[in-house]
């Protein structure tokens, strides 16, 4: 659930292929000793690993090793942090409640428009994602392929309304979901990130912004 930032695999082509097949890798760095010759007993397909077609690769020589660093997905870190910081700030506008988290959200469209929302902004049963999505729809926005930034992991089940935020996000066809803090199991067991990933949504987590989310929810304790 928490994810792996870096993973070192030695002679593990099958492991690398597994991560690539699941779409779980952003960057692959491959180091090969050009002086090393494998015998027939070690030259089977399980030891071969090819970088996916279309990957942007940078090659260099380090200490006699041929190193290729290949980017499999575009680097969206700066944009993600900008929108996610805005979402965290939106969460601070929420009126604290003993029965819900204070969360902020931003819907970012490919055309550059964005829409914000925070928990209970217009209704005592609305979550932040609902508020931001409603504003986007009211403006006539097409949400398929858009990104949504939430200070906390989108809920996967809830008691106040029949549709969870995860279901709402999937129904509207969002391509990316970015958040700072996994939802604690205080009210329900949240499996939003897992459900979204299994549905093919690109999910990114930036825990370096999680402290701001904790501050917004200090009324609930740690």
Which residues make up each language-model segment?
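Anionic group-transfer/hydrolysis microenvironments
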Residues: 12, 106, 118
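Enzymes that bind and transform nitrogen-containing heteroaromatic metabolites
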Residues: 1-85, 89-94, 98, 136
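Short beta-strand segments
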Residues: 10, 104, 151
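Phosphate/diphosphate-binding glycine-rich loops and adjacent basic-rich segments that engage nucleotide
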Residues: 219-222
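Residues that mark the start of a beta-strand
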Residues: 4-6, 102, 147
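Zn2+-dependent cytidine deaminase-like catalytic core
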Residues: 17-22, 27-30, 34-44, 109, ...
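Short beta-strand scaffold segments in enzyme catalytic cores
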Residues: 68, 102-111
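Short, basic and Ser/Thr-rich N-terminal targeting/leader segments
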Residues: 99-103, 126
